[in-house]
Amino acid sequence: MIEMARYQCMCGWVYDEDKGEPSQNIPPGTKFEDLPDTFRCPQCGLGKNAFRKID
């Protein structure tokens, strides 16, 4: 089984690899590192560099 991770933006919003991000057409199971460079936090608009992996 593949371990899915969660990443939290500085604003507090969490990207869950299990769920993806439907509002940006990111399907469930998409790894954070596979997100497009254009990915932005849907809450605050910051890019991938504003996220950190959480337990």
UniProtKB/Swiss-Prot annotation:
Its cofactor is Fe(3+). GO terms for molecular function: electron transfer activity; iron ion binding. GO terms for biological process: alkane catabolic process. Belongs to the rubredoxin family. This is Probable Rubredoxin-2. Fe cation binds at residues 9, 11, 41, 44. PROSITE patterns: RUBREDOXIN_LIKE. Binds 1 Fe(3+) ion per subunit. Keywords: Electron transport, Iron, Metal-binding, Transport. It comes from the Archaea. It comes from Methanocaldococcus jannaschii (strain ATCC 43067 / DSM 2661 / JAL-1 / JCM 10045 / NBRC 100440) (Methanococcus jannaschii). Pfam families: Rubredoxin (PF00301). Residues 4-54 form the Rubredoxin-like domain. Rubredoxin is a small nonheme, iron protein lacking acid-labile sulfide. Its single Fe, chelated to 4 Cys, functions as an electron acceptor and may also stabilize the conformation of the molecule.
